[in-house]
Swiss-Prot record:
This is Type III pantothenate kinase. It comes from Synechococcus sp. (strain JA-2-3B'a(2-13)) (Cyanobacteria bacterium Yellowstone B-Prime). GO terms for cellular component: cytoplasm. ATP binds at V22, L23, G24, N25, T26, H27, V28, R29, T118. GO terms for molecular function: ATP binding; metal ion binding; pantothenate kinase activity. The gene is coaX. Substrate binds at Y89, G93, L94, D95, R96, T173. Gene3D superfamilies: 3.30.420.40.
Length: 254
């Protein structure tokens, strides 16, 4: 599978068009940009063989086990040290840093990002753009997979963003698994959000990640500043690229 097949866009040698890629554990997300505008996003299974574009500027955020493309002068691999988030701790996930920094520069500081992917993470920064801290827990799919893998009789439950919230007191096994995972997850997130608001009464809250679309309508009534942005990490990559290009063309760099 190649990105061009899904995007129907041609590679450009003039650097107006370029590609960002987030290499995760379960998926690879490609974002095609024209200058700073995100025009197309595609998602592929992480270990599916991919045909990477040739002679196209490519910025990578390796955040999981997906294989890297071949090295070339066109490929730029980001590291945590290149994200201008203040006071990150060693080992902070690159995707968490990119999403938080993008949230801050696009929506304002202080901010809290809830990334509902394979792992669900909460990451916050204060009004100065300094990391406050966060939390990591298994995402919806990983919790369901753990029950199926480590019990003899429980089935694996699939999620659909269109599914309504199940009844809390379920009367069959599948509904009981859904209830247990979803209601306890929402209760925990509400408590984290309430604690964040005690510390930072103002500022945006951002949901991103594959399960964020499902979480948004269930958490949105809790806080009017909660927004859903599925492309925060890609926006963070774009911001880092812009900083790199600005620094390279500044008088001090000549």
């Amino acid at each position: 599978m190649s990105f061009e097949e899904g995007a129907d866009l041609n590679a450009s040698h003039c650097c107006r068009e370029w590609l960002a890629a987030v290499l995760g554990n379960t998926h690879v997300r490609w974002g095609w940009f024209v200058e700073e505008t995100l025009v197309k996003v595609e998602r592929f299974p992480a270990h599916q063989p991919l045909s990477w574009p040739q002679q196209t500027e490519l910025w990578l955020a390796p955040v999981g086990s997906a294989p890297l493309p071949p090295a070339s002068p066109w490929v730029h691999q980001l590291e945590l040290s290149q994200v201008p988030l203040r006071d990150p701790y060693p080992g902070l996930g690159l995707d968490r840093a990119l999403a938080l920094w993008a949230a801050g520069i696009h929506y304002g500081w202080p901010c809290l990002v809830i990334d509902a992917g394979t792992a669900l993470t909460l990451t916050g920064a204060d009004s100065e753009g300094s990391l406050v801290g966060g939390a990591i827990l298994p995402g919806l799919g990983l919790q369901a997979q753990a029950l199926a893998d480590h019990t003899a009789l429980l089935p694996k439950v699939q999620w659909d963003p269109q599914d309504p919230l199940p009844p809390r007191w379920a009367n069959d096994t599948v509904a009981a698994i859904r209830s247990g995972i979803l209601h306890t997850l929402l209760a925990g997130l509400r408590e984290f959000i309430a604690d964040w608001r005690r510390r930072f009464p103002q500022g945006p809250l951002l949901l991103t990640g594959g399960d964020g679309k499902w979480l948004h309508p269930h958490l949105g009534p809790l806080d009017p500043e909660l927004r859903w942005d599925p492309h925060l990490v890609l926006r963070g990559i774009a911001g880092c690229r812009q900083l790199h290009r600005t620094a390279r063309h500044s008088p001090s760099a000549e």
